Every structure is written in C-alpha cells, then in structure tokens.
C-alpha cells in the first residue's frame, strides 16, 4: 500500500485476518464470532494531514514512509474523501504561485463531511499578517466560486486566524433519523464517517429496550451520547476538552434533544465525584443521585481504562465499550470479566489496509 494506491483487491483478505485476530484475542473472555462491519474500500477518510514540500518552483503534498522515513509525493489520496482529493489539487494551484500564501507554509490539514463541507488549515513557520489574510480571503472566494463549501484557517506559533469559522456541521443518517454534529478544527472527530454511522447504529441496536439512564465517559462532541439518547430516559456525559464540550452543547440544541446533560470533567474526576471522594463546583446544580444509570458507555483513548475507572464501571449492570485498541480492551477485560460477561462483540473496520482494529463489546453483569 502506498498513499496513492489502495490494494482494494486485498480488502476481503485483510478484513478476514482482522476478524480471526480479534476472535483469537477475545477467546479468553468470549467464544462469540465478531459481528463484522465493513468500510468502503476507498474514499473513507474524512480528514487528512500532509506536510508540504517546496521543490524549486514546484510545491506538493508529502507523507513519510513509516519504516524508511523517506519522503513520498502525494498528488492524490484515494483513502480520503472525494472532497479532500478535489481540495488537494485546488489548494496547490491556489498557493503555488502566491508568495504570501506559500512562504514558510509547511503543512495543510483537511477536515470534510459527508454533507460536503470542509475546513482547511494552513500551518506556517512565520508570523501571519494582513497580506496573508487578504491573500487567503481571495483564495477562499475563488474556491467557493468553484462550488466548494470551504473555510480557511491560518495557523502559526500562538496564532490562529479564522476567515469566518473553524467548524463544519456533519449530517449523518442514523437508524432512520438525521443527526447533526458540529465538528471543530483540531478537535477529535471520527475519521471514517461511513463506519461511524455503523458504530452508532450497532450501539443503538444493542441498547434497545434499555431501562433507566445512560452514563458516558469521554463523550467528545456527543457523537454517541446524542444518538443513544432515544434509547434512555436520560443521558449524563463527561468530556474534558473545552471545544468538544461547546460542540456537544451545540449538537444537543441542533438535534432538539432534551434528555442529555454534558459535564466538563475528566473521567477520573467524575469517578471521585461518584464515589463521594471530592466535591466539584462544576457539579453544582446536578444531583448525581437522581440518575439511575443502568448502562455505562466508554470509548476511552488507546491506553484504555485506568484502574480506578475499571472499578467504577463494574458497578453498572451493563457496560458498552468501544475500543480503538483491542490490546488494552483485553487488559481491561481481565478485570471486567470477573463481574461481567461479553454478550455482544463487533469489529468495525475503521482503518482498512492497516493493522488497526476498532471493536465494540457489550458486557452484562453476571
């Protein structure tokens, strides 16, 4: 696999290998055959980052080979959305011969949606001035004249210039309902939108007929919380990153959802609050005791759940766990399987043609 070539003819084989590997890893905890959710074989990534290489008068995107660290020119990137590929050509054409935009430019980041919106961030090793703003505004207007719904951002040390906004709004069809998600530049979003839809629909399916309330740790922009709200009386969710919390609050309003409460705090802090170890000003006005959370949802970072959070989640009858690292999931399951059994197992092929696996498990109390 190279950045400009995807071995689509090998997709079935690589997916089968992942299924077998996940099943083997999960064998100590479950004999279930994973439910498998396939990715589109190309144009599945909704975001991409490229370094820029200045080669005389020429200018082009590059990536680095992970093994050899050698430079690879990238003019097309079939793993990324069609919109990113269109923008890659348009950005090079618009920047190459413009000194204000090209000088000291070292990276371009692309974020796109299925609703055909884009934020493009240009990163510089220089101070950005009014000349840059005028040139960037002209480029943005030229891109929009080509029918591209794009927002440009300039970044340099301690500097961020938004020509108009730093977000785009995604619209996803999820189990018969359109969900609106504000996605903020430089904040986490699910990279594979088609796979995200399947993950949300799987989570909805395994939690149907739920009783009581849902607690979610690490909720991001509310991706899962808001989709799952229809299955629960109430949802209480935590997130630490300010931009993600702001996006989640917007998404609650945009989707006309009235049973989700977002709290800005770390999972570890929330564990302390739930256990009565500490009191937090951020929880004033929120009576944790009135929530009857029968289900807890966790989508932790690659490091998995810390030991205190492991203990905390064991108190819930059902644990829905989405993992971007099955190795740390299995490490957590060494503890969680003492009190819970794996009742559902799914593999989500979030990153085709790579070793990476995303998976989901539903755990029910013994």
From Swiss-Prot:
Q: Which residues form the signal peptide?
A: none
A single GO BP term for this record reads:
tRNA methylation
- Gene3D superfamilies found in the cross-reference section: 2.40.50.1070, Vaccinia Virus protein VP39 (3.40.50.150)
Q: Name one GO molecular function term.
A: tRNA binding
Annotated catalytic residues:
324 (nucleophile), 358 (proton acceptor)
- Reactions catalysed, as given in the entry: uridine(54) in tRNA + S-adenosyl-L-methionine = 5-methyluridine(54) in tRNA + S-adenosyl-L-homocysteine + H(+); uridine(341) in tmRNA + S-adenosyl-L-methionine = 5-methyluridine(341) in tmRNA + S-adenosyl-L-homocysteine + H(+)
What residues does S-adenosyl-L-methionine bind to? Answer: 190, 218, 223, 239, 299
List, alphabetically, the PROSITE patterns matched.
Answer: SAM_MT_RNA_M5U (PS51687), TRMA_1 (PS01230), TRMA_2 (PS01231)
GO (cellular component) term, any one = cytosol
Report the sequence similarity comment from the record.
Belongs to the class I-like SAM-binding methyltransferase superfamily. RNA M5U methyltransferase family. TrmA subfamily.
Function, as annotated, reads: Dual-specificity methyltransferase that catalyzes the formation of 5-methyluridine at position 54 (m5U54) in all tRNAs, and that of position 341 (m5U341) in tmRNA (transfer-mRNA).
Q: What is this protein called?
A: tRNA/tmRNA (uracil-C(5))-methyltransferase
Please report the organism this UniProt entry assigns to the protein: Salmonella schwarzengrund (strain CVM19633)
Query: Could you tell me the gene encoding this protein?
Result: trmA
């Amino acid at each position: 696999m190279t950045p400009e070539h995807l071995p689509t003819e090998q997709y079935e084989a690589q997916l089968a290998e992942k299924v077998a590997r996940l099943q083997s890893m999960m064998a100590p905890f479950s004999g279930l055959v994973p439910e498998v959710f396939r990715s589109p074989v190309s144009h599945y990534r909704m975001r991409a980052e490229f370094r820029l290489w200045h080669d005389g008068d020429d200018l082009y995107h590059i990536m680095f080979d992970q093994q050899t660290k050698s430079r690879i020119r990238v003019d097309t990137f079939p793993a990324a959305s069609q919109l990113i590929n269109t923008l890659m050509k348009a950005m090079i054409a618009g920047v190459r011969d413009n000194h204000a935009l090209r000088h000291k430019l070292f990276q371009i980041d692309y974020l796109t949606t299925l609703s055909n919106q884009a934020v493009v961030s240009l990163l510089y090793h220089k101070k950005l001035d009014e000349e840059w703003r005028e040139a960037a505004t002209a480029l943005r207007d030229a891109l929009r004249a080509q029918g591209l719904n794009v927002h440009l951002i300039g970044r340099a040390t301690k500097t961020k210039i938004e020509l108009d906004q730093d977000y785009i709004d995604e619209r996803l069809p999820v189990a018969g309902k359109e969900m609106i998600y504000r996605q903020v530049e430089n904040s986490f979003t699910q990279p594979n939108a088609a796979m995200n839809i399947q993950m949300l629909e799987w989570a909805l399916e395994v939690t149907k007929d739920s009783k009581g309330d849902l607690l979610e740790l690490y909720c991001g922009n509310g991706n899962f919380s808001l989709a799952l709200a229809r299955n629960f009386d109430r949802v209480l969710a935590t997130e630490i990153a300010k931009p993600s919390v702001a996006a989640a609050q917007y998404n609650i309003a945009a989707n006309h959802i009235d049973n989700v409460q977002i709290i800005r705090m770390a999972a570890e802090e929330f564990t302390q609050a739930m256990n009565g170890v500490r009191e937090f000003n951020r929880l004033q006005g929120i009576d944790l005791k009135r929530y009857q959370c029968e289900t807890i949802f966790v989508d932790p970072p690659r490091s998995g759940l810390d030991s205190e959070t492991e203990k905390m989640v064991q108190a819930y009858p059902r644990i829905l766990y989405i993992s971007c690292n099955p190795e740390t999931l299995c490490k957590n399951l060494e503890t969680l399987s003492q009190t819970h059994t794996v009742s559902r197992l799914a593999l989500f092929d979030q990153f085709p043609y790579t070793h990476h696996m995303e998976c989901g498990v539903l755990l029910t109390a013994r």
